[in-house]
């Protein structure tokens, strides 16, 4: 969530005519969300507010604070399983942001996910925007990893524009598509959205890569240490697999994985 939040923030900043603000760091809980909302000023026309949870019922409360007009459910993963028990519980909890939308609100979610039917049902008669690699209202075509960045064609609103994304991990293209859908719902032009995506810099500890030169050898370090669940670790391994050999994977513990902890770490 944090990466896509900051992507949306970067995109919103590309439209200087509409001042915006966003969640900083990980201020996404029952304390952080109110603190973030206190930073809203009359001059702000747009805001992106991250809602976090690790227990049932938290998103409903935070969404009541934030009162969103655009609600993004980015995915549902095996996170916080110690308290959420199942991925479906995570999907339903995340969907509380859709329930909180007004009748004129816009629900944004993946075009093809196991829980897409659930999110679409909860959206009801509200407008929806979906995203996916080659399906949905916002798509990415002709994807290639070149010179330390993703190059792809961003397709939306009957337009197709080239885009460069400066972050490792194919899954982060989906984050970019989610950010694009939210920005379109907020009334932004696709050309400005591309400018914002291309200005995005990875958040510390979240797929942030750096280059080292040691004894005449070039090394790429991808730092994804901020937090982890089984699905995000799988995504991190996929990032490593995309890099040239030799490769080294360094893993720590995953927290809040519940009774399946031993299985997930095996």
Tell where the protein language model's regions lie, with residue ranges.
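Phosphate-binding loop of NTP-binding sites
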Residues: 1-109, 118-124, 183
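Conserved strand-to-helix beginnings and helix N-cap segments that scaffold or border functional pockets
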Residues: 34, 59, 84-87, 176-177, ...
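Residue-level marker for buried hydrophobic side chains located in beta-strands
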Residues: 47, 221, 249-250
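Active-site-proximal beta-strand elements of phosphoester/diester hydrolases
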Residues: 50, 220-229
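Short, glycine/acidic-enriched loop or turn micro-motifs at the edges of active sites
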Residues: 53, 77-78, 113, 226-228, ...
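Acidic, Mg2+-coordinating active-site environments of NTP-dependent enzymes
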Residues: 70-219, 245
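Active-site beta-alpha connecting loops in nucleotide-dependent enzymes
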Residues: 203-205, 225-266
